[in-house]
Curated annotation (Swiss-Prot):
Keywords: Ribonucleoprotein, Ribosomal protein. InterPro entries: Ribosomal_bL17, Ribosomal_bL17_CS, Ribosomal_bL17_sf. NCBIfam families: L17. The lineage of its organism: Bacteria, Bacillati, Bacillota, Clostridia, Peptostreptococcales. Coiled coil: none annotated. Belongs to the bacterial ribosomal protein bL17 family. This is Large ribosomal subunit protein bL17. HAMAP family: Ribosomal_bL17. One of its GO terms (cellular component) is cytosolic large ribosomal subunit. Part of the 50S ribosomal subunit. Contacts protein L32. It comes from Alkaliphilus oremlandii (strain OhILAs). One of its GO terms (molecular function) is structural constituent of ribosome.
Length: 113
């Protein structure tokens, strides 16, 4: 029983794509992507923020193993995580934009609340 979406890619490509999407979301605060990619990105980004809320060295190393930029990790632990300290989950919001012109894929904006 799979608990994730395959997104039409082999596992290494899918994992790196999702790592890049999560890094971009944490770096910029919002990104525009397809609906299914956003739902997978939300799942992983919320885990990273929850780890950052713990704030210990082990959590920092776990986040560093997933997020691709060290500056984003520093920003996550110093600025983003304290903002959500009293919130239990639900750190992201997905807003629908409508279909993409080329292939009618459902486009959304995913952003940090």
């Amino acid at each position: 029983m799979a608990h994730y979406r395959k997104l039409g890619r082999v596992s290494a490509h899918r994992n790196l794509m999702l790592r890049n999407l999560v890094t971009s979301l944490l770096k910029n605060g919002r990104i525009e992507t397809t609906d299914t990619r956003a739902k997978e990105t939300r799942r992983l980004a919320e885990k990273m923020i929850t780890l950052a809320k713990r704030g210990d060295l082990h959590a920092r190393r776990q986040v560093l193993s997933f997020v691709t930029e060290e500056t984003v990790v520093k920003n996550l632990f110093d600025e983003i995580a304290p903002k959500y300290q009293e919130r239990n989950g639900g750190y992201t919001r997905i807003m629908k934009l409508g279909p993409r012109r080329g292939d009618a894929a459902e486009m959304v904006i995913i952003e940090l609340v």
